[in-house]
Structure formats: structure tokens, C-alpha cells
């Protein structure tokens, strides 16, 4: 029983090691860079212009084979994850508002797009990128998201996003200019923790079949070894003959044990080389008595008292 336990413990150690490696590989890009929002809430009066800003933080690879895809879209606050829904901004989708730039190139959207829809996207070399909205209306209120996708060799490697809310007010309670509220560190930590938890769950689900397969292989090997040990022990037991029992042919498939009768031994006199045995001679001291003889020798009578008269 000790061998299977050791094998199972080893399999679980290997499974934990594989899970840790996959988790580190999957969460490595999460810690590489992220998107920060300097302001989480913008409150602006109707008809005003506003610029929503996001900032790319962390080490960013500036190789020629790396491209960053940046864009904007509207969304709604979900119960599980923010920015999961992608809605257009003033009838422009996130494909229309995207920015492509490499490590040594900045990009701006065309001036015609800004004039037609009152929008303009911009980015710089310091990781800041923004979208400017002119002539705000009440319909512009809502949640806005910025998205950054890292593309290596024409394949998407990693994507991060940030969220902020825009409130357009009218009337006496509306401010004269836009008022911005900075983001709290707790919100950023919650977003990062949620991203890490989601990545860990996904990697765990992907690694679970591999871990189960490894455990199954180890248990199968342990079962085969146990079966071989049992067969070897059975062969050794069958090779030793029991002197008290003899296996008889089975009757109707049920083996029976046949009892051997104990061997009887009768002591007999073995003849000597001369053909006669000492005990067979009648005159020997240890020979059995003949017919009419007494085994013990007879003794002469002893007088009761000495004759004192004869001196």
C-alpha cells in the first residue's frame, strides 16, 4: 500500500508544478503593462468639449515587430466585468476609432473624422492616448472604455482596458466647466485583482485535464505494479506443497481439499547380518520369556533367623 501512496503524492506534486508554471506564464503579461485612468468621473455641462484620457503604464516593448492597437468605445457597467460590451460612440465603432502605432511612430485619427462626428483620437510617445468630444449632449452620458491590444508578429498577445464615466448635465445644477474626479487606488486594485482572478480561473480550467491525465497515468502504473506483485506472491504460494492436504480435481468449478491419511509405522525387528537377532535367543538377559518361564529369576529362600545354637 505504500507504493501507490508515494506515486500519488508524486503525481500531485508534478501537477502542482505544472499548474504553477502555466499560471506564471499566463499571468506574466498581466504584470508587464496595464492601462490607468487618471480620472474616473467627468462632469460637464451641455455644449462643452471634453477630453477623456488613458495612460499605458509598465514596461512596453518598442521593437519593430510589436504594434499597439488602441481604441475607444462605449459600454455598460456589468455585474461581473466592466467594458465587456462594445457600443459605438456617436455611430462610430471601435474599429473606426482605433490607433495603430509602433515603438517609434505616433498616430492621430484623421481631421475629417473629427469634423464629421465631433471626435478626435490622439496618442503620444509617453503612453498617453485620449479621445476628444465636442459639443456634448445628454446622449453622450455613459461609460467610456479605452482598449490597448499588444500585437506581436500579427498575433494578439495581450489586451488591457480602462473605464471612466461621463455625466453631461444641463440647467442650474450644471457646472460652468468640466469637473474631473481622480481615480481611487482601490478601484485600480479591484480591477487588477479581478483580472488576475479571471486569468487564474481560465488557466486552472485549461490545466485541469492535463493534471487529471497525469494522475490517471500514475495510478494506472501503481495498479499494474500491485497486480504484478500479487501474481508473483500467488505463484510462490502455489509452488509450496502442503503435506497435510492434496488438491483434488474440482467438482463443478469448486475446488476441494482432500485429506491425506496419516502414515502408520509398525516397528519390526530387522534381521542381522548372521540371520539371527540377539533378542531372539532365549538365553539372553533381555530376551522375552519362553512358554512357562518367568521373566524375573527366582531367588533362594532366606532363613528367618540364624541358628545360634550352632557355634
Swiss-Prot record:
Which superkingdom heads the taxonomic lineage of this protein's source? Eukaryota
User: What keyword terms does UniProt attach to this protein?
Assistant: Cell membrane, Disulfide bond, Glycoprotein, Immunoglobulin domain, Membrane, Phosphoprotein, Receptor, Signal, Transmembrane, Transmembrane helix
**SMART domains reported in the protein's UniProt record:** IG
MF terms in GO: endopeptidase activator activity; enzyme binding; identical protein binding
Q: How does it sit in the membrane?
A: Single-pass type I membrane protein
Compartmental location? Cell membrane
What's a Pfam family this protein contains? V-set
Q: Main site of residence? A: membrane
Q: Where is this region: Disordered?
A: 267-311
Q: Which residues carry this modification: Phosphoserine?
A: 235, 248
The keyword RNA-binding is assigned to this record = no
Q: Which residues lie toward the Cytoplasmic compartment?
A: 216-311
**Any one GO cellular component localisation term in the record:** plasma membrane
Which post-translational modifications are recorded for this protein? At the cell surface, may be cleaved by MMP14. N-glycosylated.
Described function: Immunoregulatory receptor which inhibits the T-cell response. May promote differentiation of embryonic stem cells, by inhibiting BMP4 signaling. May stimulate MMP14-mediated MMP2 activation.
What's this protein's name?
A: V-type immunoglobulin domain-containing suppressor of T-cell activation
Record the organism. Answer: Homo sapiens
The uppermost taxa in this organism's lineage are: Eukaryota, Metazoa, Chordata, Craniata, Vertebrata
Amino acid at each position: 500500500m505504500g507504493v501507490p501512496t508515494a506515486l500519488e503524492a508524486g503525481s500531485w506534486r508534478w501537477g502542482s508544478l505544472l499548474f504553477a508554471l502555466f499560471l506564471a506564464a499566463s499571468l506574466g503579461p498581466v504584470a508587464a503593462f496595464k492601462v490607468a485612468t487618471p480620472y474616473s468621473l467627468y462632469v460637464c455641462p451641455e455644449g462643452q468639449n471634453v477630453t477623456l484620457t488613458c495612460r499605458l503604464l509598465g514596461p512596453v516593448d518598442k521593437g519593430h515587430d510589436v504594434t499597439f492597437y488602441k481604441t475607444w468605445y462605449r459600454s455598460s457597467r456589468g455585474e461581473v466585468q466592466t467594458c465587456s460590451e462594445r457600443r459605438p460612440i456617436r455611430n462610430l465603432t471601435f474599429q473606426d476609432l482605433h490607433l495603430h502605432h509602433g515603438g517609434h511612430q505616433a498616430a492621430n485619427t484623421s481631421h475629417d473624422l473629427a469634423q464629421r462626428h465631433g471626435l478626435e483620437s490622439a496618442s503620444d510617445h509617453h503612453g498617453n492616448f485620449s479621445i476628444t468630444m465636442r459639443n456634448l449632449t445628454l446622449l453622450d452620458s455613459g461609460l467610456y472604455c479605452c482598449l490597448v491590444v499588444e500585437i506581436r508578429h500579427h498575433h494578439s498577445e495581450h489586451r488591457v482596458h480602462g473605464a471612466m464615466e461621463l455625466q453631461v448635465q444641463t440647467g442650474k445644477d450644471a457646472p460652468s466647466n468640466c469637473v474631473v474626479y481622480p481615480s481611487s487606488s482601490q478601484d485600480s486594485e479591484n480591477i487588477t485583482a479581478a483580472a488576475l482572478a479571471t486569468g487564474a480561473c481560465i488557466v486552472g480550467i485549461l490545466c485541469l485535464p492535463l493534471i487529471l491525465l497525469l494522475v490517471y497515468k500514475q495510478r494506472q502504473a501503481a495498479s499494474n505494479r500491485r497486480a504484478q506483485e500479487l501474481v508473483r506472491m500467488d505463484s510462490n504460494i502455489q509452488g509450496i506443497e502442503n503435506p497435510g492436504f492434496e488438491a483434488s480435481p474440482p467438482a463443478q468449478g469448486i475446488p476441494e481439499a482432500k485429506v491425506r491419511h496419516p502414515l502408520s509405522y509398525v516397528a519390526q525387528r530387522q534381521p542381522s547380518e548372521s540371520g539371527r537377532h540377539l533378542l531372539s535367543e532365549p538365553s539372553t538377559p533381555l530376551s522375552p520369556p519362553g512358554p512357562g518361564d518367568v521373566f524375573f529369576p527366582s531367588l533362594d529362600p532366606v532363613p528367618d533367623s540364624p541358628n545360634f545354637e550352632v557355634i
